[in-house]
Protein backbone atom coordinates (compact mmCIF):
# COMPACT_ATOMS: atom_id res chain seq x y z
CA UNK A 1 0.00 0.00 0.00
CA UNK A 2 1.22 3.49 -0.84
CA UNK A 3 0.10 6.60 1.05
CA UNK A 4 2.20 9.39 -0.48
CA UNK A 5 4.71 11.79 1.02
CA UNK A 6 2.87 15.11 0.85
CA UNK A 7 1.03 16.70 3.76
CA UNK A 8 -2.55 15.71 2.89
CA UNK A 9 -4.51 18.42 4.77
CA UNK A 10 -2.24 21.13 3.39
CA UNK A 11 -2.62 19.80 -0.15
CA UNK A 12 -6.37 19.68 0.28
CA UNK A 13 -6.41 23.33 1.32
CA UNK A 14 -4.33 24.22 -1.73
CA UNK A 15 -6.73 22.35 -3.99
CA UNK A 16 -9.77 23.89 -2.35
CA UNK A 17 -8.32 27.35 -2.81
CA UNK A 18 -8.05 26.68 -6.51
CA UNK A 19 -11.72 25.71 -6.72
CA UNK A 20 -13.47 28.74 -5.16
CA UNK A 21 -16.69 30.15 -6.53
CA UNK A 22 -18.85 33.18 -5.71
CA UNK A 23 -22.11 33.06 -3.78
CA UNK A 24 -24.68 35.82 -3.31
CA UNK A 25 -25.20 36.96 0.29
CA UNK A 26 -27.02 40.15 1.21
CA UNK A 27 -26.31 41.66 -2.19
CA UNK A 28 -22.55 41.05 -1.87
CA UNK A 29 -20.44 38.34 -3.42
CA UNK A 30 -18.84 35.95 -0.93
CA UNK A 31 -15.58 34.82 -2.53
CA UNK A 32 -14.65 32.48 0.33
CA UNK A 33 -14.03 28.91 -0.95
CA UNK A 34 -16.92 26.70 0.15
CA UNK A 35 -17.07 22.92 -0.17
CA UNK A 36 -20.18 21.16 1.10
CA UNK A 37 -19.86 18.42 3.71
CA UNK A 38 -20.65 15.18 1.91
CA UNK A 39 -19.78 11.51 2.12
CA UNK A 40 -16.81 10.11 0.21
CA UNK A 41 -19.18 8.09 -1.96
CA UNK A 42 -21.03 11.27 -2.91
CA UNK A 43 -17.79 12.89 -4.02
CA UNK A 44 -16.90 9.82 -6.06
CA UNK A 45 -20.26 10.12 -7.83
CA UNK A 46 -19.49 13.79 -8.53
CA UNK A 47 -16.35 12.76 -10.39
CA UNK A 48 -18.64 11.72 -13.26
CA UNK A 49 -20.70 14.92 -13.30
CA UNK A 50 -20.99 16.63 -16.69
CA UNK A 51 -19.90 19.94 -15.10
CA UNK A 52 -16.08 20.16 -15.00
CA UNK A 53 -16.20 22.46 -11.97
CA UNK A 54 -18.10 19.82 -9.99
CA UNK A 55 -15.51 17.19 -10.92
CA UNK A 56 -12.77 19.65 -9.98
CA UNK A 57 -14.27 20.32 -6.54
CA UNK A 58 -14.72 16.61 -5.89
CA UNK A 59 -11.02 16.03 -6.55
CA UNK A 60 -10.27 18.86 -4.14
CA UNK A 61 -12.38 17.30 -1.41
CA UNK A 62 -11.44 13.62 -1.64
CA UNK A 63 -7.86 13.97 -0.27
CA UNK A 64 -9.40 15.38 2.94
CA UNK A 65 -10.68 11.91 3.82
CA UNK A 66 -7.19 10.72 4.77
CA UNK A 67 -6.32 7.04 4.70
CA UNK A 68 -9.86 5.86 3.89
CA UNK A 69 -9.82 6.99 0.26
CA UNK A 70 -8.64 3.83 -1.51
CA UNK A 71 -12.14 3.17 -2.89
CA UNK A 72 -11.90 6.45 -4.83
CA UNK A 73 -8.76 5.47 -6.75
CA UNK A 74 -10.41 3.91 -9.84
CA UNK A 75 -12.63 6.97 -10.33
CA UNK A 76 -9.72 9.36 -9.79
CA UNK A 77 -7.63 7.43 -12.31
CA UNK A 78 -10.43 7.85 -14.85
CA UNK A 79 -10.23 11.64 -14.37
CA UNK A 80 -6.63 11.52 -15.60
CA UNK A 81 -8.26 11.27 -19.04
CA UNK A 82 -10.64 14.16 -18.40
CA UNK A 83 -11.02 16.56 -21.36
CA UNK A 84 -10.59 19.50 -18.97
CA UNK A 85 -6.92 20.24 -18.22
CA UNK A 86 -7.69 21.66 -14.78
CA UNK A 87 -9.45 18.46 -13.77
CA UNK A 88 -6.52 16.37 -15.01
CA UNK A 89 -4.18 18.50 -12.88
CA UNK A 90 -6.29 17.83 -9.78
CA UNK A 91 -6.53 14.12 -10.56
CA UNK A 92 -2.78 13.72 -10.89
CA UNK A 93 -2.18 15.72 -7.71
CA UNK A 94 -4.68 13.57 -5.85
CA UNK A 95 -2.90 10.40 -6.96
CA UNK A 96 0.27 11.72 -5.37
CA UNK A 97 -1.29 11.61 -1.88
CA UNK A 98 -4.24 9.22 -1.79
CA UNK A 99 -3.97 5.77 -0.26
CA UNK A 100 -3.36 3.25 -3.05
CA UNK A 101 -3.87 -0.45 -2.39
CA UNK A 102 -1.39 -2.87 -3.91
CA UNK A 103 -3.97 -4.11 -6.39
CA UNK A 104 -4.40 -0.57 -7.76
CA UNK A 105 -0.70 0.26 -8.11
CA UNK A 106 -0.20 -1.07 -11.67
CA UNK A 107 -3.20 0.83 -13.03
CA UNK A 108 -2.20 4.00 -11.17
CA UNK A 109 1.37 3.81 -12.42
CA UNK A 110 0.20 3.25 -15.99
CA UNK A 111 -2.21 6.19 -15.82
CA UNK A 112 0.49 8.53 -14.54
CA UNK A 113 2.99 7.28 -17.11
CA UNK A 114 0.50 7.98 -19.90
CA UNK A 115 0.04 11.56 -18.65
CA UNK A 116 3.82 11.98 -18.38
CA UNK A 117 4.30 10.89 -21.97
CA UNK A 118 1.23 12.15 -23.79
CA UNK A 119 -0.56 14.97 -22.00
CA UNK A 120 -0.78 18.18 -24.06
CA UNK A 121 -0.28 20.31 -20.92
CA UNK A 122 3.25 20.62 -19.51
CA UNK A 123 1.90 21.10 -15.98
CA UNK A 124 0.09 17.77 -16.09
CA UNK A 125 3.21 16.00 -17.39
CA UNK A 126 5.36 17.51 -14.65
CA UNK A 127 2.94 16.62 -11.86
CA UNK A 128 2.51 13.09 -13.22
CA UNK A 129 6.25 12.46 -13.15
CA UNK A 130 6.45 13.92 -9.67
CA UNK A 131 3.63 11.62 -8.51
CA UNK A 132 5.34 8.58 -10.03
CA UNK A 133 8.29 9.07 -7.71
CA UNK A 134 6.23 8.00 -4.70
CA UNK A 135 6.39 4.41 -5.99
CA UNK A 136 9.14 1.85 -5.49
CA UNK A 137 11.34 1.09 -8.51
CA UNK A 138 9.96 -2.46 -8.66
CA UNK A 139 6.49 -0.98 -9.22
CA UNK A 140 7.44 1.84 -11.57
CA UNK A 141 10.28 0.45 -13.67
CA UNK A 142 7.66 -0.14 -16.34
CA UNK A 143 7.47 3.66 -16.82
CA UNK A 144 11.01 4.04 -18.18
CA UNK A 145 9.90 4.25 -21.82
CA UNK A 146 7.41 7.00 -20.96
CA UNK A 147 10.02 8.89 -18.95
CA UNK A 148 12.53 8.65 -21.79
CA UNK A 149 9.97 10.26 -24.09
CA UNK A 150 9.21 12.92 -21.48
CA UNK A 151 12.93 13.74 -21.30
CA UNK A 152 12.64 14.87 -24.93
CA UNK A 153 9.49 17.00 -24.45
CA UNK A 154 10.27 20.26 -26.31
CA UNK A 155 7.78 22.60 -24.62
CA UNK A 156 9.11 22.56 -21.04
CA UNK A 157 12.65 22.20 -19.73
CA UNK A 158 11.22 21.45 -16.27
CA UNK A 159 9.45 18.37 -17.63
CA UNK A 160 12.67 17.19 -19.27
CA UNK A 161 14.61 17.81 -16.07
CA UNK A 162 12.26 15.96 -13.72
CA UNK A 163 12.01 13.07 -16.20
CA UNK A 164 15.78 12.60 -15.97
CA UNK A 165 15.63 12.71 -12.18
CA UNK A 166 12.96 9.99 -12.19
CA UNK A 167 15.01 7.89 -14.62
CA UNK A 168 17.77 7.68 -12.01
CA UNK A 169 15.37 6.18 -9.46
CA UNK A 170 13.71 3.72 -11.82
CA UNK A 171 16.62 3.03 -14.17
CA UNK A 172 19.16 1.96 -11.56
CA UNK A 173 19.74 -1.76 -11.03
CA UNK A 174 22.75 -2.92 -9.02
CA UNK A 175 22.30 -6.51 -10.18
CA UNK A 176 21.97 -6.15 -13.93
CA UNK A 177 23.35 -2.64 -14.42
CA UNK A 178 21.40 0.50 -15.31
CA UNK A 179 18.64 0.47 -17.89
CA UNK A 180 20.24 1.16 -21.27
CA UNK A 181 17.34 3.37 -22.41
CA UNK A 182 17.66 5.53 -19.31
CA UNK A 183 21.41 5.99 -19.82
CA UNK A 184 20.96 6.76 -23.52
CA UNK A 185 18.32 9.39 -22.67
CA UNK A 186 20.69 11.07 -20.22
CA UNK A 187 23.48 11.03 -22.80
CA UNK A 188 21.23 12.73 -25.35
CA UNK A 189 20.17 15.32 -22.75
CA UNK A 190 23.78 16.45 -22.31
CA UNK A 191 23.17 18.50 -25.47
CA UNK A 192 19.99 20.13 -24.14
CA UNK A 193 19.95 23.96 -24.45
CA UNK A 194 18.79 24.35 -20.82
CA UNK A 195 21.50 24.20 -18.14
CA UNK A 196 19.22 22.57 -15.50
CA UNK A 197 18.47 19.75 -17.94
CA UNK A 198 22.14 19.23 -18.75
CA UNK A 199 22.91 19.21 -15.02
CA UNK A 200 20.21 16.58 -14.44
CA UNK A 201 21.69 14.60 -17.31
CA UNK A 202 25.28 14.58 -16.03
CA UNK A 203 24.20 13.69 -12.48
CA UNK A 204 21.96 10.93 -13.88
CA UNK A 205 24.85 9.42 -15.82
CA UNK A 206 27.11 9.69 -12.78
CA UNK A 207 24.60 8.00 -10.48
CA UNK A 208 23.28 5.30 -12.80
CA UNK A 209 26.67 3.62 -13.16
CA UNK A 210 28.27 1.57 -15.91
CA UNK A 211 25.94 0.15 -18.57
CA UNK A 212 26.36 -3.48 -19.60
CA UNK A 213 25.86 -2.54 -23.25
CA UNK A 214 29.43 -2.01 -24.64
CA UNK A 215 28.33 0.58 -27.21
CA UNK A 216 26.42 2.68 -24.68
CA UNK A 217 29.23 2.27 -22.15
CA UNK A 218 31.75 3.60 -24.67
CA UNK A 219 29.52 6.60 -25.34
CA UNK A 220 29.24 7.30 -21.63
CA UNK A 221 33.00 7.14 -21.07
CA UNK A 222 33.65 9.46 -24.02
CA UNK A 223 31.12 12.04 -22.83
CA UNK A 224 32.35 11.92 -19.23
CA UNK A 225 35.99 12.30 -20.25
CA UNK A 226 35.18 15.37 -22.34
CA UNK A 227 33.24 17.00 -19.51
CA UNK A 228 35.88 16.08 -16.92
CA UNK A 229 38.42 18.03 -18.97
CA UNK A 230 36.06 20.92 -19.73
CA UNK A 231 35.99 24.43 -18.30
CA UNK A 232 32.77 24.04 -16.29
CA UNK A 233 33.92 22.89 -12.86
CA UNK A 234 30.50 21.72 -11.68
CA UNK A 235 30.02 19.49 -14.70
CA UNK A 236 33.63 18.32 -14.34
CA UNK A 237 32.95 17.27 -10.74
CA UNK A 238 30.03 15.07 -11.74
CA UNK A 239 31.91 13.73 -14.73
CA UNK A 240 34.60 12.61 -12.29
CA UNK A 241 31.95 10.90 -10.14
CA UNK A 242 30.69 9.16 -13.25
CA UNK A 243 34.17 8.04 -14.29
CA UNK A 244 34.79 6.68 -10.79
CA UNK A 245 31.52 4.78 -11.08
CA UNK A 246 32.63 3.35 -14.42
CA UNK A 247 35.96 2.09 -13.08
CA UNK A 248 36.45 1.81 -9.33
CA UNK A 249 40.22 1.43 -9.78
CA UNK A 250 40.39 5.00 -11.08
CA UNK A 251 38.52 6.48 -8.12
CA UNK A 252 41.59 7.85 -6.32
CA UNK A 253 42.50 10.08 -9.26
CA UNK A 254 38.99 11.48 -9.55
CA UNK A 255 38.61 11.97 -5.80
CA UNK A 256 41.81 14.02 -5.80
CA UNK A 257 40.29 16.40 -8.35
CA UNK A 258 37.07 16.72 -6.34
CA UNK A 259 39.06 17.44 -3.19
CA UNK A 260 40.80 20.29 -5.02
CA UNK A 261 37.37 21.73 -5.85
CA UNK A 262 36.73 22.15 -2.12
CA UNK A 263 39.37 24.90 -2.16
CA UNK A 264 37.68 26.92 -4.90
CA UNK A 265 36.31 30.35 -4.02
CA UNK A 266 33.04 29.69 -5.86
CA UNK A 267 30.41 28.64 -3.30
CA UNK A 268 28.42 26.48 -5.70
CA UNK A 269 31.53 24.58 -6.77
CA UNK A 270 32.33 23.81 -3.12
CA UNK A 271 28.79 22.62 -2.46
CA UNK A 272 28.73 20.39 -5.53
CA UNK A 273 32.08 18.90 -4.54
CA UNK A 274 30.70 18.06 -1.09
CA UNK A 275 27.60 16.49 -2.58
CA UNK A 276 29.79 14.43 -4.91
CA UNK A 277 31.89 13.23 -1.97
CA UNK A 278 28.74 12.04 -0.19
CA UNK A 279 27.75 10.09 -3.30
CA UNK A 280 31.17 8.42 -3.63
CA UNK A 281 31.16 7.48 0.05
CA UNK A 282 33.98 5.58 1.75
CA UNK A 283 36.31 5.79 -1.26
CA UNK A 284 36.29 9.58 -0.81
CA UNK A 285 38.15 9.28 2.52
CA UNK A 286 41.19 11.26 1.16
CA UNK A 287 38.99 14.39 1.08
CA UNK A 288 38.56 14.43 4.87
CA UNK A 289 41.48 16.85 5.62
CA UNK A 290 40.07 19.40 3.16
CA UNK A 291 36.60 18.98 4.62
CA UNK A 292 38.02 19.60 8.09
CA UNK A 293 39.53 22.85 6.80
CA UNK A 294 36.05 23.96 5.72
CA UNK A 295 34.87 23.78 9.33
CA UNK A 296 36.75 27.10 9.74
CA UNK A 297 35.05 28.74 6.74
CA UNK A 298 33.42 32.13 7.31
CA UNK A 299 30.26 31.06 5.47
CA UNK A 300 27.82 29.24 7.78
CA UNK A 301 26.34 27.40 4.82
CA UNK A 302 29.74 25.96 3.90
CA UNK A 303 30.42 24.88 7.49
CA UNK A 304 26.98 23.30 7.78
CA UNK A 305 27.46 21.28 4.60
CA UNK A 306 30.99 20.29 5.59
CA UNK A 307 29.52 18.77 8.76
CA UNK A 308 26.90 16.90 6.76
CA UNK A 309 29.50 15.60 4.33
CA UNK A 310 31.83 14.41 7.08
CA UNK A 311 28.88 12.65 8.68
CA UNK A 312 28.04 10.92 5.41
CA UNK A 313 31.50 9.32 5.38
CA UNK A 314 30.79 7.69 8.76
CA UNK A 315 33.80 5.96 10.36
CA UNK A 316 36.02 6.88 7.39
CA UNK A 317 35.99 10.47 8.70
CA UNK A 318 36.98 9.63 12.27
CA UNK A 319 40.00 11.95 12.11
CA UNK A 320 37.44 14.79 12.13
CA UNK A 321 36.39 13.91 15.70
CA UNK A 322 38.52 16.54 17.45
CA UNK A 323 37.81 19.36 14.94
CA UNK A 324 34.07 18.68 15.19
CA UNK A 325 34.24 18.60 18.99
CA UNK A 326 36.09 21.92 18.93
CA UNK A 327 33.48 23.38 16.60
CA UNK A 328 30.61 22.34 18.86
CA UNK A 329 32.31 24.01 21.84
CA UNK A 330 32.35 27.42 20.13
CA UNK A 331 30.36 30.10 21.88
CA UNK A 332 27.24 31.35 20.06
CA UNK A 333 27.60 28.69 17.37
CA UNK A 334 24.67 28.75 14.97
CA UNK A 335 22.26 26.05 16.18
CA UNK A 336 21.82 24.17 12.85
CA UNK A 337 25.62 23.90 12.56
CA UNK A 338 25.89 22.65 16.13
CA UNK A 339 23.27 19.98 15.47
CA UNK A 340 24.90 18.98 12.16
CA UNK A 341 28.29 18.68 13.86
CA UNK A 342 26.77 16.64 16.69
CA UNK A 343 25.14 14.32 14.17
CA UNK A 344 28.44 13.99 12.32
CA UNK A 345 30.18 12.93 15.53
CA UNK A 346 27.55 10.25 16.07
CA UNK A 347 28.06 9.03 12.51
CA UNK A 348 31.82 8.77 13.07
CA UNK A 349 31.04 6.29 15.84
CA UNK A 350 28.81 4.27 13.53
CA UNK A 351 25.68 5.46 15.36
CA UNK A 352 22.56 6.53 13.46
CA UNK A 353 22.18 10.25 14.22
CA UNK A 354 19.05 12.29 14.82
CA UNK A 355 17.22 13.76 11.81
CA UNK A 356 19.29 16.42 10.08
CA UNK A 357 18.51 20.04 10.99
CA UNK A 358 17.30 22.60 8.50
CA UNK A 359 19.99 24.38 6.53
CA UNK A 360 21.08 27.81 7.80
Give residue ranges: language-model regions:
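Intrinsically disordered, low-complexity regions enriched in Ser/Pro/Gly/Gln/His and often acidic
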Residues: 1, 14, 34-36, 231
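Juxtamembrane cytosolic interface motif at the C-terminal end of transmembrane helices
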Residues: 20-22
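Bacterial N-terminal signal peptides that target proteins for export
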Residues: 1-9
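Structural detector for internal amphipathic alpha-helices that build alpha-solenoid repeat scaffolds
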Residues: 24-37, 53-68, 78, 86-103, ...
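Short coil turns that connect the paired helices of HEAT/ARM alpha-solenoid repeats
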Residues: 47-53, 80-86, 117-123, 152-158, ...
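Amphipathic alpha-helical scaffolding segments comprising HEAT/armadillo-like alpha-solenoid repeats
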Residues: 33-45, 67-80, 102-116, 138-151, ...
Amino acid sequence: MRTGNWHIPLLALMLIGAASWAQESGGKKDLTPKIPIKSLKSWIIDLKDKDASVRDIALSAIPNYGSSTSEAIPAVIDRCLDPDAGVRVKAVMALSVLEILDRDIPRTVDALAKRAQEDPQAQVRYLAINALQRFDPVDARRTITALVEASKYPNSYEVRRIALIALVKFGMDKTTGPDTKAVAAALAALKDPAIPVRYAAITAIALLGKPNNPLVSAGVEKALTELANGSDKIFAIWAKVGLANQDVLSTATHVKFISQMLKQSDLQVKLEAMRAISVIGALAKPTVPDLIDLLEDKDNFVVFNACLTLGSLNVEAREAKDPLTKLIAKKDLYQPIKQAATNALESLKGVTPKPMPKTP
